[in-house]
Amino acid sequence: MGLLARLLGGRSTERDLIAELIDDYRAEATQAIHLRQHADLARYPQVASRLRALADIEERHAGLLREHILGLGGGIPPVSPPPLAGHNQWERAVVARKAAAEKRRRLIEHATHWDPEEPTAARLLARIYDEDGETLSSYDDVVIRSDPHALD
């Protein structure tokens, strides 16, 4: 939140921070749920195993965000993701990769916004951003190894 908004009586910094953390929490939790659903539909055990490993990472990130939100006095809303997109493994992998990239973009945007005012939250978001960056090659591997013409 900018200085002018604070001077004019805009929303509190804590409320805005919590709202953004909740958005990030929802994105992490939704990604984890979708990756597990994708793993259940995977054609090959090694793909399912890789997707479940990615889901574990996303669940851990959602847990870190949940703890931070609760520590700030915020509440955790239920997460009800939209249906899993894609008609085959390749389409689902592409959707998951795009969602991971979009989630990372928002994380770094939030981290840089909150850095001077909320360093603990900014460090947490930057840490999740970095860890998500390490997983992008796994998403790419699933996309590359999937047949775009195969049917489920």
Regions picked out by a protein language model, each given a short descriptive name:
Residues 1-152:
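Non-heme di-metal
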